[in-house]
Curated annotation (Swiss-Prot):
InterPro entries: INSM1/2, Znf_C2H2_sf, Znf_C2H2_type. It is found in: Nucleus. The gene is egl-46. GO terms for biological process: axon guidance; cell fate commitment; detection of carbon dioxide; detection of oxygen; male mating behavior; negative regulation of transcription by RNA polymerase II; neuroblast division; neuron differentiation. This is Transcription factor egl-46.
Length: 286
C-alpha cells in the first residue's frame, strides 16, 4: 500500500506537462506569448486525471485506517519518551562541604556518633598521679584539729620561696577562688604560699617496704633492684663472700698457685726435666 503523501506526489507528477515558460531571449513579442497561454486547456480532466480514484471506497478506508494508525503511534511515542542511558545524579548543595565538589557522594544527614571512651568516675579518692592515693575523710583527723596544726609546717613539706616580687605578682591576679582553703583537708591558710607548702594529711604515697632491711621505696622497680643486693648475703648465711682458701699445685714443678687460672697459664710454659721423666717411670704417681 502506497502512503498518502507519496500518493499525492505521484498524482501530480502523472498529470500533463505545464505550459512552457516564455523565454526572455526569444524575439517573439509579448502578445504572441499571451495568445499561447490562453490556448492552454484548463479542464479538470487535464489537471486532475486521477481524481476518480478517490471515489473508490476500499482506497478511502485504507487511507483512513493508515491515518488512525499514524496518530496512535504518535500518541504512544509521546507517552513513552526515550530515557537517557546514563543520568548524572543531582546533588543538593547543602550537603556538599565545598561548592566545587559536585561529583562526590553527599554527606550523611546524621553524622556517625563517635565512640567515647568510658572513663572512671571522678571521685574524691581517685588520684591522677601514679603511685599516689587519697585517704578517706574519716581516716584522718577532724578539720578543727588540723586547723590548729596549720601553722606548724612539717620538715618534709615542699619548699616554696617567698619574696616580695612574688607577693606583688600574686596581688595583681584577681582573686576568683576566694579564701586559701585546701579542697581535701578543708584547712584555711593565710596566703597561697602556705597553702602550696602545706602537706595534706589525706594525700598518701604507695610504699614498698623491703622485707630484709625495712627500707621504703615509692616504686616497685626500685624495690626489685634493691633486693638484688640481699641475694648473695642470703645465700651465704648473712656473711659477705670471703676469698677462697683452695691452693692448686703444679704436677710438673710442684709449684702452688691460688687459682686454677694461674695454674693453667703456668702449665703451658712448664716443662719436665730429664730427672723428673726418669722418676715418673719409677714412681707413676709423680
Amino acid at each position: 500500500m502506497v502512503p498518502m503523501n507519496d500518493f499525492w506526489v505521484k498524482a501530480i507528477l502523472s498529470s500533463t506537462n505545464p505550459s512552457p515558460v516564455p523565454s526572455t531571449t526569444s524575439t517573439v513579442s509579448n502578445d504572441e506569448n499571451l495568445d499561447k497561454t490562453l490556448d492552454f486547456d484548463c479542464s479538470t480532466q487535464t489537471v486532475f486525471p486521477t481524481l476518480p480514484m478517490f471515489w473508490n471506497p476500499t482506497l478511502v478506508q485504507q487511507m483512513l485506517a493508515l491515518y488512525q494508525i499514524q496518530q496512535q503511534q504518535i500518541q504512544f511515542s509521546a507517552k513513552l519518551a526515550p530515557q537517557p542511558l546514563f543520568q548524572e545524579p543531582t546533588i543538593q548543595k547543602e550537603f556538599l562541604p565545598f561548592p566545587h565538589q559536585s561529583r562526590k557522594r553527599p554527606l550523611p544527614i546524621d553524622p556517625k556518633k563517635t565512640k567515647l571512651r568510658k572513663l572512671n568516675e571522678d571521685t574524691v579518692t581517685s588520684s591522677p598521679v601514679s603511685g599516689m592515693f587519697i585517704k578517706e575523710e574519716a581516716d584522718v583527723k577532724s578539720v578543727e584539729e588540723l586547723q590548729k596544726e596549720a601553722d606548724l609546717l612539717d620538715e618534709t613539706a615542699a619548699y616554696v620561696e617567698v619574696t616580695e616580687e612574688s607577693r606583688q605578682k600574686i596581688d595583681e591576679i584577681p582573686n576568683v577562688i576566694g579564701d586559701c582553703i585546701c579542697r581535701l583537708c578543708k584547712v584555711k591558710y593565710e596566703d597561697v604560699f602556705k597553702l602550696a607548702q602545706h602537706k595534706c594529711p589525706r594525700i598518701a604515697h604507695e610504699e614498698y617496704k623491703c622485707p630484709d632491711c625495712d627500707k621504703v621505696f615509692s616504686c616497685p622497680a626500685n624495690l626489685a633492684s634493691h633486693r638484688r643486693w640481699h641475694k648473695p648475703r642470703n645465700e651465704l648465711g648473712g656473711s659477705p663472700p670471703a676469698q677462697s682458701s683452695t691452693i692448686v699445685s703444679c704436677s710438673t714443678c710442684f709449684n702452688s698457685f691460688p687459682t686454677k687460672k694461674m695454674l693453667k697459664l703456668h702449665s703451658s710454659t712448664c716443662q719436665r726435666s730429664p730427672l723428673q721423666d726418669l722418676l715418673s717411670r719409677v714412681i707413676p704417681t709423680m
